[in-house]
């Protein structure tokens, strides 16, 4: 199994530090609003990575934090005349509603920054004691010039970073690239006691503290959105490696950017979509499938037209499941014919192709193509006369591989009940006996409209669902 490591810019053989255990940290949301589709892409992709690792037999310790104190949360609390805690609690709850709808599994731990203030203070003390941080007027800053590898993740040297840094001029800093580990209290803002006076933690330190607390000083995988490479992940590396003198993470994974109608998503352009507003109109699994139909590192363009295409694609998969479930109910248990044994071999090959796609840097786009091939082959070769063993084997495999992608087809329902189909077939047979060809054709057409194809054979009428 190989994955692309942002740090080395190459695909590497995946070998976790401990056999069959993966310690994985994903940067979670700042909880001041509903999550948007850019957030959702990251959470869906890394949930899928986790699911595939579990499918392969790994135990995955999956930690995803909540940033529950931040300027955006403070501003929203002021706007609504409420507390930061109330805003954070509300949007953590809303996050879980969206995540559950999208089939995103709960993390092993969902730590919150405000519950780790003591740990953060202890971590900052280590950095001060080792000479990597300095205190000015109740603020504590990390001194980037002291960390010789600063810029190694974004592949930039300090001079390049300085030239491109859009940093507020802060007279307190020794260097514009230095960043706050602890921020002195401002009037009206929440604050905690510390050796440097009342204040609150900086954003970057929170992730270093929470990831290492729950997963150890070196992680297997650290993952997030492309906008986090610099400065957030770069700063996490600097803090963590300065504190512990060992690599912070073995592998770094980042998704590609998501644009809307070929433009960067922004509220001012009116092309901003939250997960909530889309899942009110579309099955959440359609949005999930859309996100996985492109390779996770590729940029992705979002539009409602493209989402409609994903909806049609999802319906093809969903209808295959409906058809397979129906056949599992009506077929008889008997030994497999030679043709059916060949089909088993063919589906085992599909499973291998699916795994090969996922083993190659989690290529969900190719894996989904395999599911479509499976659906097509099942629809073309299975009927009410197939062996129950064969149908159940294919159904179980299809659902298991779909589950790796987080697709359960839970809303897939049979559009027409089996009893109704059999009743109409009987009616048609009666019409044929009476040579009432017009009525017989009308019944056939009526069933076809509802996704049922009839086939007249010497053994009798066979039927199957096509959607």
Swiss-Prot record:
Keywords, in A-Z order: Aminoacyl-tRNA synthetase, ATP-binding, Cytoplasm, Ligase, Metal-binding, Nucleotide-binding, Protein biosynthesis, Zinc
Principal subcellular localisation of the protein: cytoplasm
GO biological process terms on file: cysteinyl-tRNA aminoacylation
Catalysed reaction, written as an equation: tRNA(Cys) + L-cysteine + ATP = L-cysteinyl-tRNA(Cys) + AMP + diphosphate
Cofactor dependency: Zn(2+)
Positions of short motif 'HIGH' region: 29-39
MF (Gene Ontology): ATP binding; cysteine-tRNA ligase activity; zinc ion binding
Binding of Zn(2+), residues: 27, 207, 232, 236
Residue numbers binding ATP: 267
Compartment(s) where it occurs, according to its Swiss-Prot or TrEMBL record: Cytoplasm
Motif mapping: 'KMSKS' region: 264-268
Entries under Gene3D superfamilies matching the protein: Cysteine-tRNA ligase, C-terminal anti-codon recognition domain, HUPs
The record's free-text note on cofactor binding: Binds 1 zinc ion per subunit.
PANTHER family: CYSTEINE--TRNA LIGASE, CYTOPLASMIC, CYSTEINYL-TRNA SYNTHETASE
HAMAP family in alphabetical order: Cys_tRNA_synth
Subunit structure: Monomer.
Family: Belongs to the class-I aminoacyl-tRNA synthetase family.
Name of this chain's protein: Cysteine--tRNA ligase
Species: Caldanaerobacter subterraneus subsp. tengcongensis (strain DSM 15242 / JCM 11007 / NBRC 100824 / MB4)
């Amino acid at each position: 199994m190989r994955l692309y490591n942002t740090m080395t810019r190459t695909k590497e053989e995946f070998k976790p530090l401990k056999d069959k255990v993966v310690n994985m940290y994903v940067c979670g949301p700042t909880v001041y609003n509903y999550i948007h589709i850019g957030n959702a892409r990251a959470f869906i992709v890394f949930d899928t990575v986790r699911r595939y690792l579990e499918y392969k037999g790994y135990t995955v310790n999956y930690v995803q934090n909540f940033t529950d104190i931040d300027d955006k949360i403070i501003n929203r609390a002021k706007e609504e005349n409420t507390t930061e805690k109330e805003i954070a609690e509300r949007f953590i709850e809303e996050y879980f509603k969206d995540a559950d709808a999208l089939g995103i599994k709960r993390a092993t731990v969902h730590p919150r920054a405000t519950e780790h203030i003591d740990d953060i203070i202890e971590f900052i003390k280590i950095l001060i004691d080792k000479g990597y941080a300095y205190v000015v007027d109740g603020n504590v800053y990390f001194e980037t010039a002291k960390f010789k590898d600063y810029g190694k993740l974004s592949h930039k040297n300090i001079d390049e970073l300085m030239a491109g840094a859009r940093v507020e001029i802060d007279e307190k800093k020794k260097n514009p690239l230095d960043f706050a580990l602890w921020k002195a209290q401002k009037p009206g803002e929440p604050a905690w006691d510390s050796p440097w006076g009342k204040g609150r933690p900086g954003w970057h330190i929170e992730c270093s503290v929470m990831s290492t607390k729950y997963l150890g000083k070196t992680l297997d995988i650290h993952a997030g959105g492309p906008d986090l490479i610099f400065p957030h992940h770069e700063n996490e590396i600097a803090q963590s490696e300065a504190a512990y003198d060992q690599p912070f993470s073995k592998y770094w994974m980042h998704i590609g950017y998501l644009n809307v109608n070929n433009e960067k998503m922004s509220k001012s352009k009116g092309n901003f979509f939250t997960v909530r507003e889309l899942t009110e109109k579309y099955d959440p699994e359609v949005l999930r499938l859309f996100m996985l139909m492109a390779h996770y590192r590729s940029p992705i363009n979002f539009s409602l037209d493209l989402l409609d295409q994903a909806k049609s694609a999802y319906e093809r998969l969903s209808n295959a499941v409906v058809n397979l479930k129906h056949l599992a109910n009506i077929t008889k248990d008997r030994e497999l014919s030679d043709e059916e044994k060949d089909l088993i071999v063919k589906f085992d090959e599909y499973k291998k192709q699916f795994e090969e796609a996922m083993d190659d840097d989690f290529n969900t786009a190719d894996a989904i193509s395999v599911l479509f091939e499976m659906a097509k082959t099942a629809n073309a070769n299975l009927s009410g006369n197939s062996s129950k063993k064969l149908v159940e084997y294919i159904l179980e495999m299809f659902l298991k591989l779909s589950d790796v992608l987080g697709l359960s087809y839970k809303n897939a329902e049979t559009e027409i009940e089996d009893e109704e189909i059999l009743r109409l077939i009987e009616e048609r047979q009666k019409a044929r006996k009476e040579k009432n060809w017009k009525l017989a054709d009308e019944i056939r057409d009526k069933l076809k409209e509802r996704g049922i194809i009839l086939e007249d054979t010497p053994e009798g009428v066979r039927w199957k669902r096509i959607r």
